[in-house]
Swiss-Prot record:
Swiss-Prot/TrEMBL keywords: Membrane, Transmembrane, Transmembrane helix
Subcellular location as annotated: Membrane
InterPro entries the record matches: Cys_repeat_1, EB_dom
Membrane topology: Single-pass membrane protein
Source taxon at top rank: Eukaryota
TM regions (residue ranges): 26-46
Keyword Nuclease applies: no
PANTHER family for this protein: EB DOMAIN-CONTAINING PROTEIN-RELATED, PRION-LIKE-(Q/N-RICH) DOMAIN-BEARING PROTEIN 25
Pfam families per record: EB (PF01683)
A Gene Ontology cellular-component term: membrane
Annotated protein name in UniProt: Prion-like-(Q/N-rich) domain-bearing protein 25
Organism: Caenorhabditis elegans
Length: 672
């Protein structure tokens, strides 16, 4: 590097001007004192350009001008003049509008070497080399620069600690992808600092904290790409991480594949909800109730076939583009999504950053939730005032109809943020400053609204303001005008999880080991068990079944005994059937041979719950027909062939005595 030999025009001219004026007026003894005082002021002004505890490095030939340097060059502060030293740092000095070399005067590392210093100018002490930054070794309790190289010190960090990097003369911690940052130099794994977050460049994805080219993952059939990994598909009722895993018309809710609206879970399959009078394991074909059939079994109509199969030549078969696996038809497209996409209901959708446009919450990254077609972060570490709401970790004022907005959470009076303006949604109109429905609109609120007291109100995510419990999403409750998770549960990806011990609140019901709010007639629902007053969850609304009407919050009617397929007739009323563990009023409601005890469907004494059926160990012998034996799993329980594949030389058949599908084997050893 070239040394700067010219004097600093700023300090040098000032000193010269003052010196010549004083020579004419001040006696020599006083002049000598003033000279040293001015020299001290000059040195202090230069030293102040270095961090605390450090001193500017001057060349032997020019004491007025510190050595300049290049921040990216670790050797730029080392020269053959003898004034340069190992272990200096390159610091920007505003006085010179340039970078200058700064060093520690500590002599623990020798006369021509400065020990490693922190950003505050403190000498880094050590007992082993591992405590020193790259290019330094521990010597006499201090981290000293390596001087045994012909290319100066090999230290690339210019004096920062291990795990730090130098940015404009300051030491900053190196951070992983997804962490907060101030400069790209901090970001590891080939990422960049964008919006104060270390992120991969466009066209790259994060794989094990390394940015790699986003060319998609080639996952095998039966698996799906998620977070740059191939994960196994999951059937209804099984645990899941994302809805892209879930098959057979199910989505991932509360970490379990749950049947979509208008479908019900029947022994591992999502079966459409119909108004027929058949049992839940049957469907109506030509006015006759016939058993449902899995892949490979006989059929007479498509509606018999479950698991995505179709009736072809009298047998339930998978259509073109699908393969029979685990008793389901698996689409070959399930593994064709790129790593920056997710599979939702058999379609590939791009993942979306917080603030981007979305259709499903599964698209949103960083555990955000798709609210009003925008990925909204559920994470808020800031505390907002009472007239503000937190959106994507920032505080925004609540605003009235007609005002500019960032998200619908800001909008008051049931308005929504449409085109960045709080407006009344379609189907509502402004009346006295509030968005109200048009003559009830036949109960047709928007998909992100709920009907309460003949008015449409926006649904609300956890952590946002509410007026009624029915507005709160994710099983949260409206407490202190805020949707919050009830005691004993926590917010996990926008859903309140907990209550697995069956101890739900009095206004909740246990479904799939989770607590869900009970819902009155006319309000939104996910499961029939939520609906009160003998109503049913139809089109995501608790409604009275055909033939009955709402009388004081209770569905009355149906005296002809024609209840729906998921109901039972008792005392001139239709009651919803409920699985084991759910709330009940009468035993006739309880499925799987359970009984209504203490308002819950429970297995009677001497029996246990096996695949949602109360059974005894001795009762499994008569599940198959004469001359056949039931096949048991590793826990000595009958195999549910709608969930697991039957072993060799066995077959899947419906057991009328057990009211379920089991694997049976002929005692003669021949397959059926």
């Amino acid at each position: 590097m070239e040394e700067t030999c010219s004097e600093s025009p700023k300090e040098s001219n000032i000193i010269s001007f003052i010196w010549h004026k004083l020579l004419k007026r001040v006696p020599p003894p006083i002049m000598i004192c003033l000279f040293f005082l001015l020299l001290q002021i000059f040195v202090i002004s230069v030293v102040s350009q270095c961090p605390p505890g450090l001193t500017p490095l001057f060349s032997n030939s020019n004491f007025n001008q510190p050595l300049t340097c290049t921040p990216q060059d670790a050797c730029s502060c080392y020269s053959s003049s003898g004034s340069s030293r190992f272990g200096t740092i390159c610091q920007y000095a505003s006085t010179y509008n340039n970078y200058i070399c700064c060093y520690s005067t500590n002599t623990q590392c020798g006369s021509n070497s400065s020990p490693q210093v922190s950003a505050s100018g403190q000498v880094v002490t050590c007992s082993t080399n591992t405590q020193c930054a790259s290019g330094y070794t521990c010597n006499n309790g201090a981290c000293c620069p390596n001087t045994n190289s012909n290319t100066c010190s090999s230290n690339g960090n210019n004096g920062c600690l291990a795990g730090q990097t130098m940015v404009n003369g300051q030491c900053y911690n190196s951070v992983n992808i997804g962490s907060a940052c101030q400069s790209t130099q901090q970001c590891l794994g080939g990422s960049q600092c964008q919006n104060n977050i270390c992120q991969c460049y466009s066209g790259y994805v994060n794989v094990n904290q390394q940015c790699v080219i986003s060319n998609g993952l080639n996952c095998q059939l039966g698996t799906v790409s998620y977070n740059s990994q191939c994960i196994t598909l999951a059937s209804p009722g099984q645990n899941c991480q994302t809805s892209s895993q879930c098959i057979d018309n199910s989505v991932c809710m509360n970490q379990m594949c749950t049947c979509n609206n208008n479908y019900r879970l029947v022994y591992g399959y999502c079966v459409p909800i119909t108004s027929s009078i058949c049992q839940q394991t049957q469907t109506l074909v030509n006015n006759q109730c016939v058993l449902l059939s899995i892949v490979g079994e006989t059929c007479i109509a498509n509606q018999q076939c479950v698991g995505g199969a179709m009736c072809n030549s009298g047998t339930c078969q998978c259509t073109n583009g699908a393969t029979a696996m685990y008793g389901y038809c698996i689409s070959s497209s399930s593994s064709s999504c790129n790593s920056n996409q997710v599979s939702i209901n058999g379609m590939c959708y791009n993942t979306v950053q917080v603030g981007g446009s979305c259709s499903f919450s599964q698209q949103c990254l960083n555990n955000a939730v798709c609210t009003n077609n925008i990925c909204v972060s559920t994470f808020c570490s800031v505390s907002c005032s009472t007239n503000q709401v937190c959106i994507s970790n920032q505080c925004y004022n609540y605003v009235s109809i007609g005002s500019q907005c960032v998200g619908s959470q800001q909008c008051l009076s049931n308005s929504q943020c449409i085109s960045s303006i709080c407006q009344c949604p379609q189907g509502t109109q402004q009346s006295n400053g509030v968005c109200t429905g048009n003559n009830n609109n036949n109960n047709q609120c928007q998909p992100n609204q709920v009907l309460i007291n003949n008015q449409c109100y926006n649904t609300v995510s956890i952590g946002f303001q509410c007026q009624f419990p029915q507005q709160c999403l994710g099983n949260s409750q409206c407490m202190n005008s805020m949707c919050q998770c009830p005691t004993g549960s926590t917010n996990v990806n926008g859903y309140c999880q907990g209550g697995s011990n069956g101890q739900c609140n009095s206004n909740q019901v246990l479904i799939n080991n989770q607590c869900y709010n009970t819902v009155s007639i006319g309000f939104q629902c996910q499961f029939a068990q939520q609906c009160l007053g003998n109503s049913q969850c139809l089109n995501s609304i608790c409604q009275c079944p055909s033939g009955s009407s709402n009388v004081n919050g209770y569905c009355q009617g149906g005296s002809n005994g024609q209840c729906n397929s998921n109901q039972v007739y008792y005392n001139n009323q239709c009651y919803n059937t409920v699985p084991i563990g759910s709330q009940c009023q009468i035993t006739q409601q309880c499925l799987g041979n359970s009984q209504c005890m203490n308002s819950f469907c429970q297995c009677p004494s001497g029996t246990t719950n096996v695949n949602n059926f109360c059974t005894t160990s001795s009762s499994s012998s008569n599940l198959c027909s004469a001359g056949q034996t039931v096949q048991l799993d590793s826990s000595n329980q009958p195999i549910n062939c709608l969930v697991s594949t039957c072993p060799n030389n066995s077959f899947c058949q419906y057991s009328s005595s057990g009211q379920r599908y089991v694997c049976c084997r002929s005692t003669s050893g021949k397959k059926k």
